[in-house]
């Protein structure tokens, strides 16, 4: 019988919390602290007749032996980076649709996604855009100015449009899950900072490195004033893909220069402890983050 990879993946991910085999094959360890005889799992199949559907029968952990399924080997002596959480992106367009739902439906959905109930997904991490993403109603930054004007002191900085939908939804999510971690990612700086003065493409002009670093500081501080803690930021969404609106091209050298010359010092000066994540794109170009 052909195994459906999506179906088995759902099983493996759930099973890993209860059962694992060590490198000495033949030994199976059960996490007895959970006192669970069965592992629940959710199923998705290629036909989409089932999409993340919880199954009525689970896996009997008492009868699992090595070789029953493909083995998941965990070497507790080999440790890599810590996981901050699991979740998804919440863009402005999604926030707008959530905001426009009736209150009871929105509450039910947010509790299903972020709550701590038995049937909740319990997402623990969110990624939001700093300014507009390409899935917002229209492109914007937090310091848009008429052509020819600049504001290196960020006197005109304002969360603006995000106060309509995104921030109210984030506040509701935080009420449900106070410990949720939120990462901010910019699709583009204000157009006046860029080589082409456009929301699409272009590059960040070096003379505005300090201004853009202050832009990040103002963002984190302004969100904190709204009761929203930004635990991490990325420097640029998809830095090598500059065709969306908004977007910007940013090489690894440019990213390294911006962080070392301006963003890092600005974070230190303003006691910002948010993580800085490098290369906000697919894991297909490991040389980019390594070089930064």
Show which residues each predicted segment covers.
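Bacterial N-terminal signal peptides
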Residues: 10-19
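Active-site neighborhood of glycoside hydrolase catalytic domains
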Residues: 211-218, 222-229, 239-292
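N-terminal zymogen propeptides
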Residues: 30-62
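Bacterial Sec-dependent N-terminal signal peptides
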Residues: 18-35
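N-terminal catalytic cores of secreted or lumenal carbohydrate-active enzymes
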Residues: 52-230, 251-253, 261
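Bacterial N-terminal signal peptides that target proteins for export
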Residues: 2-10
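Conserved beta-strand positions
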Residues: 128, 184, 235-238, 278-281
